[in-house]
Regions:
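Structural core segment of the AMP-binding/adenylate-forming
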Residues: 67, 94-160, 540
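ANL superfamily adenylate-forming
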Residues: 42, 129-179, 287-336
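Conserved AMP-binding/adenylate-forming core of the ANL superfamily
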Residues: 36-90, 107-112, 159-163, 202-203
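Conserved ATP-binding/catalytic segment of the ANL
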Residues: 401-468, 485
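Conserved ATP-dependent adenylate/AMP-binding module captured primarily in the ANL superfamily
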Residues: 73, 106-136, 208-228, 258-272, ...
């Protein structure tokens, strides 16, 4: 490694425990305090105490034993985020079986591929629609025996099956599960190709859980610690956060409806939140649009500029001038407190991950009073590998390695990670395992840098690196993240490999575009095709592109862009399940437009 940094461990972490031990320890430590909260069918919040949740998991695990689920058997869950998902996951893993998560948005063909690759024997579907998806490919899944529907009382049925299983039989099964045993196979297709199953062990999860709580103790421990989780539990990061809450003092709130997320924030009042950058961009955009284009809009613009100025002064350690203090106090009363109220009024920190965080957005929220702590991780690292600390965080970096994690840079600048949390390997793909994990170092595929204090900066994606016809190396991520902060832009894909200049394909968000047009006091559009033709919308995209170009050199800047009237979706193959653009698929899909409109030969 050209450069290497290891974060020391303040307290030894026992990676030989199983995942269920985290639940047991919390139930012993704080048995009567709320652990998992959720909305019932009437919209009221209900809670399981730690002891109640532990007992629920045991009851479900007994049902699985009664139905013949054996150690090493794969059991799948296809459901939105819910307490049932979390409890089933724990029950499956507690008896040495493997949880195989499937996104609700996965196609029947993808379900069949995942079920066959992992040899799923039992599946839990949230509702009729998910059950029908499974049934449509059941004849192609030779190992699948049972399918249960959660909405039809599957968990009650499972508990009934388990009444004849003794406590001793459950604990005998649980004691056999060790840190080296597999806990789950998580399928991720990334932004390129077919799904790959990533094998994560109990030790992976336990190690990264306590590495996280020891790295960020002021978020994990203390009074009134609450997290409202609304990411899909099929995502490894969401499952990690469940364990992080259990290992600390955190009450976990679960929400599965983004349409009610703002009211959920207000009711649950989280002390911290976890979200992808797009959520924070949308909150900023909504606040800007609500202010409008008149006097209120000008006041908001000045308040936003003051927040960023405050954040820069804080980060640079230069102190705050009297003028800045006065303006900040004024805008705090007028605007900042309202924005903080969006997150429930008690939120102290927000953790951002999953995609690059635009610096302007990070500085805005930091100046408002909500530090956005950017982190970095992969499914292969059992979610987080590094995160900014609550004290001394540095905007523009993805923070420090978690305790016990080593980071290094390869000769080509590729970021590599070594820790007890690095995955066992790629299921049924030993050749990928051997090429991606070398001497314990996971090769992430991302380009980065490590400063003398151990803070890591991501500079691009190795496989996404664009080399123009003139030989200029361009990392598209910074340009794409900046363009996507525009209220009208949904996705941006920068192109230009082996081409004479850099260009971009931009898609629009129709609802956000109309909200923005209304805030400007102009007529809304009926569809994306009309939006593409709208000169006001075009001017806004052009402004966003110009702002992105200010961040890079002339040779790296976007010279041309095309706004397309087609949304990027999973259905048309242009988005992954985690809402990231599939770069090559976008290039192939819009190949004719790219060849004839962007890079048309001279004379045509």
């Amino acid at each position: 490694m050209l450069k290497e940094y290891t974060q020391p461990v303040t307290k030894p972490i026992d990676g030989d425990k199983n995942v269920f031990s985290v639940v047991v320890e919390r139930a012993e430590r704080k048995p009567d305090e709320p652990l998992v909260s959720y909305k019932d069918g009437t919209g009221s919040w209900r809670s399981f105490t730690a002891a109640e949740f532990r007992d629920k998991v045991i009851a479900l695990a007994k049902g699985l034993i009664a139905r013949g689920v054996m150690p090493g058997d794969a059991v799948s869950i296809i459901s939105s985020t819910s307490w049932q998902w979390a409890a089933l996951d724990m029950a499956i893993m507690s008896i040495g079986s493997l949880t195989v998560p499937v996104y609700e948005t996965n196609s029947p063909a993808q379900v069949a591929t995942i079920f066959n690759d992992s040899q799923v024997t039992m599946a839990f579907a949230e509702n009729d629609a998910q059950r029908d998806k499974i049934e449509s490919v059941r004849s192609r899944c030779s190992t699948l025996k049972d399918v249960y529907v959660i909405d039809f009382g599957a968990l009650n049925t499972l508990e009934e099956y388990g009444r004849g299983v003794s406590d001793e039989e459950f604990w005998e099964r649980e004691r056999l599960v060790k840190g080296d045993d597999l806990a789950t196979i998580v399928y991720t297709s990334g932004s390129t190709g077919m799904p790959k199953g990533i094998e994560l062990s109990h030790g992976n999860f336990v190690y990264v859980t306590y590495a996280g709580t020891q790295s960020m103790p002021d978020i994990a421990y203390g009074r009134d610690r609450r997290l409202l989780l609304f990411l899909p539990l099929a995502h490894a990061f969401a499952r990690y956060m469940v364990l992080y809450c259990f290992a600390g003092d955190v009450e976990l709130g679960l929400s599965n409806n983004l349409k009610t997320i703002l009211s959920d924030f207000g009711e649950f009042k989280p002390s911290f939140i976890l979200a992808v950058p797009r959520i924070f961009e949308k909150v900023y955009t909504a606040a800007s649009q609500k202010a409008g284009a008149g006097m209120k809009g000008r006041i908001f613009a000045k308040a936003a500029a003051t927040a960023r100025e405050w954040s820069h002064a804080q980060q640079e350690g230069n102190g705050f001038s009297a003028s800045l203090r006065m303006r900040h106090a004024m805008y705090d009363r007028l605007i900042y407190r309202t924005i903080m109220g969006v997150f429930g009024g008690h939120c102290e920190y927000a953790v951002s991950g999953g995609a690059p965080l635009d610096g302007a957005i990070a500085h805005f929220f930091n100046g408002v009073g909500l530090p956005l702590l950017e982190g970095y991780g992969m499914t292969e690292t059992c979610a987080p590998a590094m995160v900014n600390p609550t004290k001394g965080y540095r905007i523009g970096t993805v923070g420090l390695p978690l305790q016990g994690v080593s980071v290094g840079l390869g000769e080509d600048g590729e970021l590599c990670i070594k820790s007890r949390a690095v995955c066992v390997g790629y299921h049924n793909h030993p050749e990928i395992t051997q090429s991606q994990i070398v001497d314990g170092w996971l090769h992430t595929g991302d380009l980065g840098d490590i400063d003398d204090d151990g803070f890591v900066t991501i500079t691009g994606r190795k496989k996404d690196l664009i080399i123009t016809a003139g030989g200029k190396n361009v990392s598209p991520g910074i340009l794409e993240a900046s363009v996507m902060t525009s209220p009208v832009v949904d996705q941006c894909v920068v192109i230009g490999d082996r081409k004479p200049f850099i260009a971009a394909i931009v898609s629009l968000d129709l609802d956000e575009t109309n909200a923005w047009l209304a805030a400007q006091g102009v007529e809304q559009v009926s569809d994306l095709a009309e939006a593409v033709r709208n000169p006001i919308v075009y001017a806004e995209v052009e402004r966003a592109v110009n702002a992105a170009n200010d961040l890079v050199s002339r040779a790296e800047s976007i010279r041309k862009f095309e706004i397309v009237p087609e949304p990027f979706t999973e259905e048309n193959g242009l988005l992954t399940a985690s809402m990231k653009a599939r770069r090559q698929a976008v290039i192939d899909h819009f190949g004719e437009l790219i060849d004839t409109r962007i890079y048309a030969p001279k004379g045509r």
